[in-house]
Amino acid sequence: MKSISNRDKLQDLLTQYYLNTNEKMVFLNSTGEVIALNEAAEEVFADDNDYSQMTNAVCRRCEGYSNEYDIMSCENCFLEALEIGKGSFQVFIRTKDNKIQPYTASYELIDHEKGIYAFTLHNVSPQIQRQERMYQRKMMQKTISAQENERKRISRELHDGIVQELINVDVELRLLKYQQDKDELIDNSKRIEGIMSRLIDDVRNLSVELRPSSLDDLGLDAAFRSYFKQFEKNYGIHVNYHTNFSAQRFDNEIETVVYRVVQEALFNALKYAQVDIVEVSLQLNENNIIAEVSDRGVGFKRGDDPKGTGLGLFGMNERAELVNGTVNIDSQINRGTIVTLEVPITD
């Protein structure tokens, strides 16, 4: 009698759970016909209470589930699997208001004799939204930190370089009015002209580092050719540049990421590789932009984290993630370093 009482109590609890839970519960037979569904599930699947018209209702609403093939895939459908797993998985369901929502789902055979399956859905949208907000805050903090570091670098460049040169020009100009000798006056004037010429170059270089106008006006290939020419002039390192690009243009954010990652990799080669030649390859295929910066320098161990400008060598991957790209770094001691950026492109 006690076991019957416990069974009745359990049955009552399960019934209350079925009726009152926010978890969407659907029971189907082996042909995909809906046998029953709770009120929570009716929000997604039922246009009316006529279950006989709801054969394949799950399939009609399902936009795919996350598997080894893709984030949203119908391949090897869980509804048709020969072996039903006991674990949960992520599935994407189109709701009545035509929105695609992610759910944590389970699909299990609960009655072997009658071939009854239970399909349950738990809404994970709030958790995903919280995770997205946390990720956005984290990325904002990193962006602000990178901006502040860049501002500090520019401030040092201005103070230690350009401002000091301007002070020298100011002093030289003040001294000119006291000079009587014509030849000396000419020599000093030429020296001031030289200082001013260097100042113009410094300002131009700083401007290019901040945001080259050629990148906005002409695209990646033209911007890189101009930058590499200036890089060689300023630092004495020859850049062997290979590309199959011509005049293709891409989303502004993609072009910026490719330009900055290559720029960062070049500066790291300049500072740490101890080489006088760097290879840069920029290739476009059907689905990706692939940028590669390689040197035959001193290299480093994978556990090391050499410092660089801006985001740093390993921080480049975070910038690449903004456009769904990846950065791979391959380095060996005394054999050099290869930095490869891959960015997917869409029409």
Swiss-Prot record:
Domain of life: Bacteria
Domain Histidine kinase: 153-347
Entry-annotated residues carrying Phosphohistidine: 159
Chain positions recorded as [4Fe-4S] cluster binding sites: 59, 62, 74, 77
Pfam families: HATPase_c, HisKA_3
Main localization (coarse): cytoplasm
Stated regulation of activity: Activated by cysteine desulfurase, Fe(2+) ions and cysteine and inhibited by oxygen and ADP.
Function in brief: Member of the two-component regulatory system NreB/NreC involved in the control of dissimilatory nitrate/nitrite reduction in response to oxygen. NreB functions as a direct oxygen sensor histidine kinase which is autophosphorylated, in the absence of oxygen, probably at the conserved histidine residue, and transfers its phosphate group probably to a conserved aspartate residue of NreC. NreB/NreC activates the expression of the nitrate (narGHJI) and nitrite (nir) reductase operons, as well as the putative nitrate transporter gene narT.
Subcellular location: Cytoplasm
Note: NreB may sense the oxygen concentration directly via the disassembly and reassembly of the FNR-type 4Fe-4S cluster. The iron-sulfur cluster controls the functional state of the kinase domain. Under oxic conditions, the iron-sulfur cluster is destroyed and the autophosphorylation activity of NreB is decreased. However, under anoxic conditions and in the presence of iron ions, the iron-sulfur cluster is formed and NreB is autophosphorylated.
Record SUPFAM superfamilies: ATPase domain of HSP90 chaperone/DNA topoisomerase II/histidine kinase (SSF55874)
Protein name: Oxygen sensor histidine kinase NreB
Consequence of changing residue 62 to S: Impaired in nitrate and nitrite reduction and also exhibits a growth defect. Inhibits incorporation of the iron-sulfur cluster
UniProt cofactor(s): [4Fe-4S] cluster
The reaction(s) this protein catalyses: ATP + protein L-histidine = ADP + protein N-phospho-L-histidine
PTM summary: Autophosphorylated.
Keyword Iron recorded: yes
GO molecular function: 4 iron, 4 sulfur cluster binding; ATP binding; iron ion binding; phosphorelay sensor kinase activity; protein dimerization activity
Entry note: cofactor: Binds 1 [4Fe-4S] cluster.
Keyword Nucleotide-binding: yes
Recorded GO CC terms: cytoplasm; membrane
